[in-house]
Amino acid sequence: LTSAQGLSASTAGALLTVSVAAAVASGIVLGLLTGRYPMRRSWLVLSIMVASATMWAIVLALPGPAPLWLLVLLVVVISVGGPGSVIGFDLARTFNPSANLGTAQGMVNIGGFLASLLVIAAIGWILDAMGGYTFESFRVALLVQFPVWIVAIIGVLATRRKTRKVLAADGIHPHTMREV
């Protein structure tokens, strides 16, 4: 925020505070939504990923630093991702037999953290290879997130399809979005 976007340290710090507040507030909202609409949890996850990717695409497509209002919006949207990732634990708990629950929870945990760490490392490697913390270096480095989102979206869609087949075999037929 300070290097590529040219923000002061105090403004960057304020954005981090906004991030924490957005994560707390969205955690409460997502908890209510997943409790009220349990068969729509995958849509919540997909919406969060698409919103994050869209915000990053907008910010990274700009020819120069983003206006502060757009950075605030970016921070709010990407801050929903933390609480949103917890939905994966809820899905693993709901749709796996108790004998496999530990493995399922472990896969959700390690998958999310491993993807995050690999993205962070790749961003660092790209920044180093490009010679520093310029706006253009950050723009290129932050593009590494997009393939991860694509893989994650494909994974959510594939597991949702399998889960719906299992539910259908048990006589449970979730309504499509058109039917809701």
Give a label for each model feature.
Residues P83-P97:
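Intracellular juxtamembrane helix-capping segments at the cytosolic ends
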Residues W43-I58:
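Structural signature of the two symmetry-related core transmembrane helices
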Residues L68-V86:
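Hydrophobic core of transmembrane alpha-helices in multi-pass small-molecule transporters
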Residues T159-V180:
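Intrinsic disorder in cytosolic terminal tails and internal cytosolic loops
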Residues S98-G131:
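A late C-terminal transmembrane helix in Major Facilitator Superfamily
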Residues R139-A158:
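Symmetry-related core transmembrane helices of the 12-TM Major Facilitator Superfamily/SLC fold
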Residues L1-T11, D128:
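Short amphipathic helix-loop junctions that connect adjacent transmembrane helices
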Residues S26-R40:
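Helix-to-loop junctions at the C-terminal end of transmembrane segments
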